[in-house]
Amino acid sequence: MFEPDFVTLKTDDIVISACQAVMEDDGFCGYCLRIENNSNDKIQILGKDFSLTDDQGNSYLRSEIGFNGEILELNPGEYFEFEDMMPVSFRAAVLYGTCRISKEHVKQIKNIKIPALELFTNQRSSLVLN
């Protein structure tokens, strides 16, 4: 059985973990993302700005409000998991970026980095790049 290798970053009691998702079709590449609220405040996940740079040097930006258009709220101790996949024309790429998060009692929006994740279309495991 495949056990994914998660890479993790922690910023201000927000933990973001990511790993490559195994795809049966080599024409697709996928990833899993987990956002944990380890703070004492309720948080809102307002959006994401993800970049993908392939092994040919091409860059793609995906900027969205929320996740799938939904702005999420997480109470202390709660987490959210998200999976996504994309058709690809490369053998390897790096996924990186930020999530826009605000805490309930702090009227400030922060860009929290996601861990950089190397993705492969031939289903090799991920590598830590941070």
Regions of interest found by a model, annotated:
Residues F2-P4, M86-N130:
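Terminal connector regions
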Residues K42-Y60, I101:
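Short acidic, flexible loop segments centered on an aromatic residue
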Residues G27-C32, Y96:
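Short, solvent-exposed loop/turn segments enriched in Ser/Thr/Gly
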Residues M1-G27, L127:
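Low-complexity, acidic Ser/Thr/Pro/Gly-rich terminal tails and inter-domain linkers that flank the onset
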Residues L52, E64, E73, I112-T121:
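Beta-rich interaction modules in large eukaryotic scaffold/regulatory proteins
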Residues Y60-A92:
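Intrinsically disordered, low-complexity Pro/Gly/Ser/Thr-rich segments with frequent PxxP/GP/PP motifs
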Residues R34-S39:
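Asparagine-centered strand-capping/turn motif at beta-strand->loop junctions
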